[in-house]
């Protein structure tokens, strides 16, 4: 086809595409998916395009749409993470993008390949533009309350344990310390006690003898006699 014919055809195709109800291919104008998940887009076409191959392509420029995946009869066709399946019975075809990434966002086309060169690249009236948006996924919940940064760790079998303070009463006799028990069990300790105990008793007896009350020698009074102070 001569370039002049293409230039004349393109405005006509654009005008035809603006006529309400003239879209042989229709679909959602915008779709939104989440990173890591799958996104399906369903496009409809007219009955006269039932036997034609259906294409899902990414819009690269004003006149170029790079094919990503194309149907093969009614069987599913796949290219990497993108698959397409034609449903001739209800005149629709479905495109599925798996494991979405942020780079998958952009402008795509639901398109029907009618076999002519100028229509394969400039199919204004045999395609439908779909804007794909991809949003980041939500972070997994790890048991922390949003906003406070405090992790809450709990065991399903844990239970509250109440401890009572130690209470000491007058009737409670504290146990001897390990040092005291070791001293009492030492034979050297008892030998030392047996040697010093008589000396201690003798000194105590002498002290009591010196401090005993004295009787008055001149009388028979039973009262003790004290020196005048």
UniProtKB/Swiss-Prot annotation:
How this chain sits in the membrane, per its record, is:
Single-pass type I membrane protein
Q: What is its main location?
A: membrane
Sugar-modified residues? 90, 99
Question: What ranges are annotated Extracellular (topological domains)?
Answer: 22-188
Q: Does the keyword Acetylation apply?
A: no
GO terms in the biological process aspect are: immune system process
Q: Where in the cell does this protein reside?
A: Cell membrane
Residue ranges in the Cytoplasmic topological domain are 210-229
Cystine crosslinks:
43-110
User: Residue limits of the Ig-like V-type domain?
Assistant: 22-126
Task: State the signal peptide span.
Answer: 1-21
Task: Give the residue spans that cross the bilayer.
Answer: 189-209
One Gene Ontology cellular component: plasma membrane
Carries keyword Glycoprotein? Answer: yes
Extract the InterPro entries matched here.
CD300_family_receptors, Ig-like_dom, Ig-like_dom_sf, Ig-like_fold, Ig_sub, Ig_V-set
Report keywords, A-Z: Cell membrane, Disulfide bond, Glycoprotein, Immunity, Immunoglobulin domain, Membrane, Receptor, Signal, Transmembrane, Transmembrane helix
As for family, the record states: Belongs to the CD300 family.
Q: Mind telling me what this protein is named? A: CMRF35-like molecule 6
The coding gene here is Cd300c
């Amino acid at each position: 086809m001569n370039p002049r014919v293409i230039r004349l055809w393109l405005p006509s195709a654009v005008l035809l595409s603006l006529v309400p109800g003239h879209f042989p291919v229709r679909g959602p104008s915008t779709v939104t998916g989440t990173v890591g998940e799958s996104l399906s887009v369903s496009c409809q076409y007219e009955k006269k395009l039932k036997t034609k191959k259906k294409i899902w392509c990414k819009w690269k420029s004003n006149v170029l749409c790079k094919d990503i995946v194309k149907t093969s009869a009614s069987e599913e066709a796949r290219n990497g993470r993108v698959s397409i399946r034609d449903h001739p019975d209800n005149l629709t075809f479905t495109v599925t993008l798996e494991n979405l990434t942020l780079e998958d966002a952009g402008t795509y086309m639901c398109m029907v390949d009618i076999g002519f060169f100028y229509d394969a690249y400039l199919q204004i009236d045999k395609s439908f533009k779909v804007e794909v948006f991809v949003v980041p996924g939500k972070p997994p919940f790890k048991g922390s309350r949003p906003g406070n940064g405090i992790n809450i760790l709990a065991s399903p079998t844990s239970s509250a344990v109440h401890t009572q303070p130690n209470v000491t009463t007058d009737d409670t006799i504290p146990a001897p310390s390990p040092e005291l028990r070791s001293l009492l069990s030492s034979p050297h300790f008892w030998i030392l006690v047996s040697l010093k105990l008589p000396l201690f008793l003798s000194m105590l007896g002498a002290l009591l003898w010196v401090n005993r009350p004295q009787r008055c020698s001149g009388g028979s009074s039973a009262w003790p006699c004290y020196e005048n102070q």
